Amino acid sequence: MIGQLMNLKATELCLGLPGGAEAVESPAKSAVGSKRGFSETVDLMLNLQSNKEGSVDLKNVSAVPKEKTTLKDPSKPPAKAQVVGWPPVRNYRKNMMTQQKTSSGAEEASSEKAGNFGGGAAGAGLVKVSMDGAPYLRKVDLKMYKSYQDLSDALAKMFSSFTMGNYGAQGMIDFMNESKLMNLLNSSEYVPSYEDKDGDWMLVGDVPWEMFVESCKRLRIMKGSEAVGLAPRAMEKYCKNRS
């Protein structure tokens, strides 16, 4: 029965061109197929784009930490530009050498200042004092004294066993008295002399005190017999300086 119906349907007459039924059915099938093909192509394109985006992100993510590690990696050796000299010496060693030189220079300068009692003015007044027959030297600061009287008292205390004689301490006080000077020069007593800026030796007391302090470089207490030639030359030089 079913077979007869199918045969009847197949032989049934209908309006339209031959093969129309197949043509009507085929568009639906083609539409369905086209829909499936479009959806598949869209899905494929989306998958490809997502894969591309994911790959780019991975590259960026992997590249960023590399840059950070290169910048902040403390374990890497320093660049070759930091090595100087041969054998290679690093910059910090070179800097330490310069610092040591500057510190040594500062220490030398401070020691010189300490030797000069902390200043140029005080160092200019500091002179050595020697005495013939004395096994030691002394230093006096001429700026601490205001006159020949004060200086003679200080020298008498320093070399008391040598300066005390027939004249006692008076032989070193009145330097400007010519008669006493000549008596000292003709005797065996000790008289004080000094070396001026020109390198000449003169008797202490032949020039005013201020000039003596400025020109004195060294003091020497010598025997009067050895200082005979100093008195006339000292007076002559003082007269030339005044003129």
From Swiss-Prot:
Keywords: Auxin signaling pathway, Nucleus, Repressor, Transcription, Transcription regulation
Name of the protein in its database record: Auxin-responsive protein IAA7
PROSITE patterns associated with the record: PB1 (PS51745)
Subunit details: Homodimers and heterodimers.
InterPro entries in UniProt: AUX/IAA_dom (IPR033389), AUX_IAA (IPR003311), PB1-like (IPR053793)
Gene: IAA7
GO terms for cellular component: nucleus
Tissue/organ expression: Highly expressed in stems and flowers.
Record-stated family: Belongs to the Aux/IAA family.
GO BP terms, alphabetized: auxin-activated signaling pathway; gravitropism; response to auxin; response to jasmonic acid; response to water deprivation; response to wounding
